Amino acid sequence: MMNKNYIKYCSILVMVCTTLAFAQTELNFTNAGATGQNGPTQTQINTAYDGTTLDDDVTINTQGIQEWTVPATGTYTFEVYGAQGGRSYLYGTSSWHDGGKGAKAVADFSLTQGDVLKIMVGQQGVEYARADRGAGGGGGSFVVLSSGTTLLMAAGGGGGAGD
């Protein structure tokens, strides 16, 4: 079974430092529990972010791509994680191989109030219960500055397990 702690961190964390006093806010963008080849819907996002600092601040105009407007000019630290690959049944035993863990990337960016970011959070690869094929790879996670479609960050997903 997939490491439960890794599921919690397969997300995009954005830490905002907007004042000289270094007040910090942490935003945690997730895949909202979406599975398969399509990302989350607006309904899934609304449910996942209800009661959080992202409540009512994220929209989905294209399924799977979250759009968020930068609320204040400042330096933003991004931690971007790719999703883990799916697990696969180990031939001749009653055990499973876990898929590879996704990459992690960290960087700081100066953003301006009103900038719109397009955020895609990878989803875990599909597991495979037969011993003759491998599981699906994890999805990559991406952050794009939508004004010029400039890629700010990317983290690749892990490979799917095989026999």
Indicate residue ranges for each PLM-predicted region.
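Secretome/extracellular-domain signature
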Residues: 99-163
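Extracellular and analogous surface-interaction loops
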Residues: 57-76, 107-115, 143-147
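Boundary/junction segments of secreted and surface-exposed precursor proteins
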Residues: 21-44
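Extracellular beta-rich ligand/substrate-recognition surface
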Residues: 50-62, 93-101
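A short beta-strand element within beta-rich, extracytoplasmic domains
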Residues: 75-84
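Extended, low-complexity, turn-rich repeat/linker tracts enriched in Gly/Pro/Ser/Thr and Asp/Glu
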Residues: 84-89, 125-129
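Short, solvent-exposed loop/turn elements at domain surfaces
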Residues: 36-40, 86-90, 161-163
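Bacterial Sec-dependent N-terminal signal peptides
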Residues: 1-24
